[in-house]
A protein has these predicted regions:
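Juxtamembrane intracellular "pre-TM" segments in multi-pass secondary transporters
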Residues: 4-13, 194-224
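Extracytoplasmic gate region of multi-pass secondary transporters
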Residues: 37-38, 220-264
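Helix-breaking motifs and short loop linkers at transmembrane-helix boundaries and internal kinks
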Residues: 49, 81, 102-108, 250, ...
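Conserved MFS/SLC helix-loop-helix module at the cytosolic interface between two early adjacent transmembrane helices
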Residues: 68-107
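Helix-loop-helix hairpin linking two adjacent transmembrane segments in secondary transporters
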Residues: 137, 146-193
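C-terminal transmembrane helical hairpin of 12-TM major facilitator-type secondary transporters
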Residues: 284-331
Length: 406
């Protein structure tokens, strides 16, 4: 745990801010590519004449491709310059997204999503490794908060823009827009990403010792379990919020979109604040406070009365998004600091893989618990909330076991 009194100056200088914004821009396009699939579902169902089960296969194919790629990538990602790895993966991601833009059959779209998932799933791990390598511990919270702001920006700016493009020009153009947006980001990455050579000795490509090294250490397993519990503590509820608010609370689709727009704006601001507080008061302490505070909106949102006014319900969802997403910032800073630089890329690739698995488990768990009534509403959302509380308490316990080494 950090000693706050001994922390040096934590001010982010200009070139560091530019790097944070560049990494956040890469994440923005990556997250937008994933998130835009949900509101575009109706377009796919109609054009390809598929049912919801086949559409869920498109979604899960991305997640599982990302998980497998991240796990395999853990074997060799630390053998390459961080900049070279980031550029290669981002090019592959843009190619996969471009394939989505020209997809005209269901099978081709499935192939395109798998391609995007393979590269997109590894980008996050490399970006987080760059933060861990470039920023010292006392600045890592701010840097992580800035990059995490990409999720909020994707919710507020990316997804609504993608929907409008789909409405006016067609869903293919939404993916084309992401590619066009990503090209200048790619150029900036080539020009300005710092060169971070591998700290490892040359090894055979087929050598799996790095993956074994990551998974064989107890401290690594504790850190991985810690972050999986953090993700499960949010995603068990997040995956069902929209349908619950629409079916049970009577929200219109426009009002449902307000959940993400308002919540995204607030989390964009709060992510920087949480990062600052994490650096000033310590990651463990801020994480503890945020988890305890987050339990309140988790229980509130899963127990909302049907006659609650819309503005009050939106207030609950906004507080939920701010606090639940806020937990991730200090937890991610703790995670990157629990790994030595020479294996950080491999570890973060494994973590990205398990993060994809955790999001899938959270969705499956919520789906198994919820019961749809004949009138279309859902029951047992409260039980989903109790599971989320349990995962958060587990994360709180495991956070005390995470050892800071770098």
């Amino acid at each position: 745990m950090e000693s706050v009194a001994s922390l040096p100056k934590t001010k982010i200088v200009r070139h560091e801010l530019f790097l944070i914004l560049l990494l956040a821009s890469i994440q923005f396009t990556n997250i937008m590519d994933f998130m835009i699939m949900f509101p575009l579902q109706d377009y796919f169902l109609k054009q390809f004449q598929i049912d919801t089960a086949m559409f869920s296969l498109v979604l899960s194919s991305y997640s599982f491709a990302a998980a497998i790629a991240a796990l395999i990538g853990a074997n060799f990602i630390d053998r390459f310059n961080r900049k070279s790895a980031a550029i290669f993966l981002y090019v592959g991601f843009l190619v996969g997204t471009a394939l989505c833009a020209v997809a005209n059959t269901y099978s081709f779209l499935l192939f395109a999503r798998i391609t995007a998932g393979i590269f997109g799933g590894m980008i996050s791990g490399v970006i987080l490794s760059i933060i861990g390598d470039v920023f010292p511990m006392e600045k890592r919270g701010k840097a992580m908060g800035g990059v995490m702001g990409a999720f909020s920006a994707a919710s507020v700016l990316g997804v609504p823009s993608g929907i409008r493009i789909a409405m006016t020009s067609g869903w293919n153009y939404t993916f084309a827009f992401i590619v066009v947006l990503g090209l200048p980001i790619l150029v900036l990455a080539i020009l300005y990403l710092p060169s971070l050579p591998s700290k490892m000795e040359k090894q055979k490509v087929a050598d799996f010792s790095q993956l074994i090294n990551v998974l064989s250490k107890r401290d690594h397993l504790v850190a991985l379990a810690f972050f999986m519990s953090v993700i499960l503590g949010g995603f068990t509820v997040v995956t069902s919020i929209a349908v619950f608010m629409e079916r049970n609370m009577g929200f219109s689709k426009t009002q449902v979109s307000h959940i993400y727009e308002i919540g995204g704006i607030c989390t964009f601001v709060s992510s920087w604040i949480v990062g600052f507080l994490s650096d000033k008061f310590g990651k463990h302490k801020v994480f503890l406070i945020l988890v305890l505070l987050a339990l309140l909106p988790i229980l509130a949102i899963t127990h909302l009365p049907k006659d609650l006014p819309v503005y009050m319900a939106l207030g609950v969802t906004t507080v939920f998004m701010v606090l639940v997403s806020g937990r991730v910032i200090p937890s991610m800073a703790m995670l990157t600091s629990a790994i030595r630089p020479e294996v950080r890329g491999s570890f973060m690739s494994v973590n990205s893989s398990l993060q994809s698995v955790a999001t899938g488990i959270g969705a499956l768990l919520a789906g198994a618990i919820l019961i749809q009534l004949p009138n279309g509403t859902f029951e047992r959302f409260d039980i989903v909330g109790y599971f989320a509380v349990g995962f958060n308490l587990l994360a709180l316990y495991l956070s005390r076991k995470v050892k800071i080494v770098s």
